[in-house]
């Protein structure tokens, strides 16, 4: 397929909002034993539940290794789920897959950002990561979609959210981290985002959620629910290490105007827990040099904000937590025309993320 040397914006493309119509959702099958406990079996059950929940609303394509293809195909026994063979290093397609962009002529293309496992040799979560850096290209080859590659710019899809009308939200903790693009200034990073996603206004939150090992991805902390309205992870507990992070984010959001000049409406979503892995859960993860150690004393970055908007539905994590019911009620209130489906998210959280992190929506073509 073609690899344009221009930029999406120059070619009339933009990143659509997540609530715009999807053609399908992409996922990657988990198996890495130094990240997923017990050989990945509990995580595979969790991913299966997520895939089947999404498949109620739209088609799903799951990428699996050659070794796991037969197992994945057998477990994902749903006529709306396709399984394709792709080699990967891990299962975070939000960060390794393409960021799809659309135009008004019915075309869909993809941005293939550079990937360095959330920090490369300065805080990255595993090595090597070359197969993960190829995931976006392989997906775009399968779909026969043109690819914009940013060889000299590292970005993960979980570090950005857009409203589809020219505004992007991100965090300084991630995008300005020296382990991503140390050769670029904030203004230069903004320029790349503007050129590749067709955004005009960028809202910088200082930090993401406490102990988020991705260096504070915004998709675990704050997201758009519609143009002009965001959902922010929240705690009123002044002793919670997230308290100051939430307060700082709220100040920025309340002071900001989006690309259309609107003042943002901020909805608050309680943070579950605090949640921790058990010793047994940690012991089930293989110990391999260069991988992320698991420790039951380290708080997990659990968040109800880490959900996926699908065609007519919301697929969100539950944690067997007292706040689960409140989270569901809030999601139903801010998405009154969507069906909210809660899926157990603990096993995904133990691996370092949640439902939004393990999914990547492919927008449907549109014509103006």
Curated annotation (Swiss-Prot):
Pathway: Amine and polyamine biosynthesis; putrescine biosynthesis via agmatine pathway; N-carbamoylputrescine from agmatine: step 1/1. Its EC number is 3.5.3.12. InterPro entries: Agmatine_deiminase, Peptidyl-Arg-deiminase_porph. The keyword tRNA processing does not apply. Gene3D superfamilies: L-arginine/glycine Amidinotransferase, Chain A (3.75.10.10). Mediates the hydrolysis of agmatine into N-carbamoylputrescine in the arginine decarboxylase (ADC) pathway of putrescine biosynthesis, a basic polyamine. Belongs to the agmatine deiminase family. This is Agmatine deiminase. The lineage of its organism: Bacteria, Pseudomonadati, Pseudomonadota, Gammaproteobacteria, Pseudomonadales.
């Amino acid at each position: 397929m073609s690899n344009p040397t221009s930029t999406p914006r120059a070619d009339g493309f933009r990143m659509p909002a997540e609530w715009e119509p999807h053609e399908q959702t992409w996922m990657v099958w988990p198996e890495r034993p130094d990240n997923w406990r017990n050989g990945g079996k509990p995580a595979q059950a969790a991913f299966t539940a997520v895939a089947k929940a999404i498949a109620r609303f739209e088609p799903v394509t799951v990428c699996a290794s050659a070794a796991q293809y037969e197992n994945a195909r057998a477990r994902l026994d749903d006529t709306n789920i396709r399984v394709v063979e792709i080699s990967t290093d891990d299962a975070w397609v939000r960060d390794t897959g393409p960021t799809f962009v659309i135009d008004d002529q019915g075309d869909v293309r993809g941005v293939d950002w550079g990937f360095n496992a959330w920090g490369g040799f300065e805080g990255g979560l595993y090595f090597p990561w070359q197969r993960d850096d190829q995931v976006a290209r392989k997906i775009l080859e399968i779909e026969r979609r043109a690819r914009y590659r940013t060889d000299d710019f590292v970005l993960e899809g979980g570090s950005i959210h857009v409203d589809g009308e020219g505004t992007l939200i991100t965090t300084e903790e991630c995008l300005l981290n020296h382990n991503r693009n140390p050769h670029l200034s904030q203004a230069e990073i903004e320029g790349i985002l503007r050129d590749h996603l067709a955004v005009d206004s960028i809202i910088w939150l200082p930090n993401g959620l406490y102990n988020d090992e991705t260096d504070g991805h915004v998709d675990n902390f704050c997201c758009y629910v519609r143009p002009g309205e965001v959902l922010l992870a929240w705690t009123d507990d002044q002793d919670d290490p997230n308290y100051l992070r939430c307060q700082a984010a709220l100040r920025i959001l309340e002071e900001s105007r989006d690309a259309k000049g609107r003042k943002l409406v901020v909805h608050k979503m309680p943070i579950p827990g605090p949640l921790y892995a058990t010793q047994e859960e940690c012991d089930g993860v293989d110990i391999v040099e260069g991988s992320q150690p698991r420790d039951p004393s380290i708080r997990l970055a659990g968040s109800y904000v880490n959900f996926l908007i699908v065609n007519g539905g919301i697929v969100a994590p539950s944690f067997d937590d007292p706040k689960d019911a409140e989270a569901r009620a809030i999601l139903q209130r801010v998405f009154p025309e969507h069906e909210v489906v809660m899926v157990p998210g603990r096993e995904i959280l133990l691996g370092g993320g949640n439902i939004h992190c393990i999914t990547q929506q492919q927008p449907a073509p549109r014509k103006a």
